[in-house]
Amino acid sequence: MNDKNNSRETEQNLILGKNPVMEALKADQPIDTIYLAGSGTIFSKIASMAKNNGVVVKNVNDQKLRQMCGTATHQGVVAVCACAEYATVEDILERAEEKGHAPFIIICDEIEDPHNLGAIIRTAEAAGADGIIIPKRRSASLNQTVHKTSAGAASWIPVARVSNLASVIDELKEKNIWIYGIDAEGADYTTVDLNGGIAFVIGSEGFGMGKLIKEKCDFLLSLPMYGHVNSLNASVAAGIFMYEAVRQRNK
């Protein structure tokens, strides 16, 4: 893979909420400090897990957490990570090899809404995808909203952030990975064979994939629409495609 597209980078990050923080601890994600504003079984469990991981725990009041998070919902639990480390595309391919199956990758093109990105990550992890690829520009990053919306899944699945999505797609094709773009003009998604190495490309709501990325796709796939609306939320559509791949690949 191109070195520019395949170098690890880090980003300061907060993880908010009980379940996302617990999942980050289970995944041994690097955390500097956990701030707790509450008591009870869950808070005690988080404190114990943090201690076992060598993470500093500070008991604070709710006002302190509001100062840290603004208006975001924190449930009385905030983890300050040393960094949010992005994977490389090679990491994702190696993960597929270690799992003993053909690569199953999700590419997000211009998904700027962190709630959508978080929901896509959550579904991708649940569906057993090997990783997510996002562009550096015009994309949500692995921020606190993404972590919270993913319900902790962002701690378990590698996310690569690349400078040139089009060139990465070319490199994936060279590795015999078929690129399937989700697009209203595509063929019925149930008519294609999703075995083998695959990557789904999910574009932004309203605009879809960029012109160049769309042209790079080997196939375009669509969902049949029988009602009055002509599109679905990006994360909902992505979930349907992912689980069709799961169904076919686990026959």
Residue ranges of predicted features:
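Short beta->alpha connector loops at strand-helix junctions that form conserved
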Residues: 61, 82, 109, 135-136, ...
